[in-house]
């Protein structure tokens, strides 16, 4: 059985000044006087936190590599070290650690002098979850994440980060890092210490 409830009749004062209407808008009126907190993107930019997991980059060889650990990995995979080029030693640890390994396309090339270099390093960001597992797995601190979060593109092809793009993002990040020292990820030495005690079976260079 439906119970009918009689509405309370409005007084003449409530009818004239729309008091019920004003009561309904009190939340709106209250917040209308508060300072706005909305960031009007893209006209306004935000500053990501220190541990923000943004677009990926490659650190290049610039003389700041943690020694002797970096040289040990270079000798292990017989890598040719070139100043200004990626630190990657083609160990494939990033691909093995990734929940979606299909996003990585990594190839090494053997030079006539017997040394090896990374020739292909593509990352399909359409498949990436930005979990950072690949960054943690990198033994030479080559792969890392920056504060870049504007990664929209018009085509699927533009969503693939090539080796050249990763190196360029890395150079730009290092230059900005000098001006913004507070926004720094885990230090190179700390990561190398973590991997120094890891007894994971490594693949042979010819298997990479």
From Swiss-Prot:
It is a peripheral membrane protein. Its main location: membrane. It catalyses: a quinone + NADH + 5 H(+)(in) = a quinol + NAD(+) + 4 H(+)(out). [4Fe-4S] cluster 1 binds at residues 88, 91, 94, 138. InterPro entries: 4Fe4S_Fe-S-bd (IPR017896), 4Fe4S_Fe_S_CS (IPR017900), NADH_quinone_OxRdtase_chainI (IPR010226). [4Fe-4S] cluster 2 binds at residues 98, 128, 131, 134. Gene3D superfamilies: 3.30.70.3270. Its EC number is 7.1.1.-. Residues 79-109, 119-148 form the 4Fe-4S ferredoxin-type domain. Keywords: 4Fe-4S, Cell inner membrane, Cell membrane, Iron, Iron-sulfur, Membrane, Metal-binding, NAD, Quinone, Repeat, Translocase, Ubiquinone. NDH-1 shuttles electrons from NADH, via FMN and iron-sulfur (Fe-S) centers, to quinones in the respiratory chain. The immediate electron acceptor for the enzyme in this species is believed to be ubiquinone. Couples the redox reaction to proton translocation (for every two electrons transferred, four hydrogen ions are translocated across the cytoplasmic membrane), and thus conserves the redox energy in a proton gradient. Belongs to the complex I 23 kDa subunit family. This is NADH-quinone oxidoreductase subunit I 2. It comes from Aquifex aeolicus (strain VF5). The lineage of its organism: Bacteria, Pseudomonadati, Aquificota, Aquificia, Aquificales. The gene is nuoI2.
